[in-house]
Amino acid sequence: MTPHESLMRLALEEAGAAIREAARVLGARRLTGCTLYVTLEPCPMCAGAMVMACLDRCYFGARDARQGCCESVYALPGDPAFYHRLPCVGGLMEEEAAALLRRFFQARRSTEEGGTP
């Protein structure tokens, strides 16, 4: 498994775990009344999970021109083909979010190359 595949697998597991934990805490399968705040625009799988969980809305910082599925590449959460739709608002503290992501990936690359973060 490549480092990218490993990171994607971890991200998907964490997103699913967060939704399951929220559902457990609320005692409900649907997360109506809940708002999600994330650093990076959700990918297709995460955007689909938001729709399936019936979240009320999502705010994200940095846009993802390659995989962003809230507005950059595709607006999955607003697609009328789905029973539940939710608004997504991007660009929330965008510069800060982008800087945070850059630092995260720089540290990750440093660790993968044998350095210290």
Predicted features along the sequence, with ranges:
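Immediate flanking context of iron-sulfur cluster ligation sites
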Residues: 28-41
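Pre-active-site segment of Zn-dependent metallo-hydrolases
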Residues: 19-26
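Zinc-dependent deaminase
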Residues: 1-16, 29, 45-117
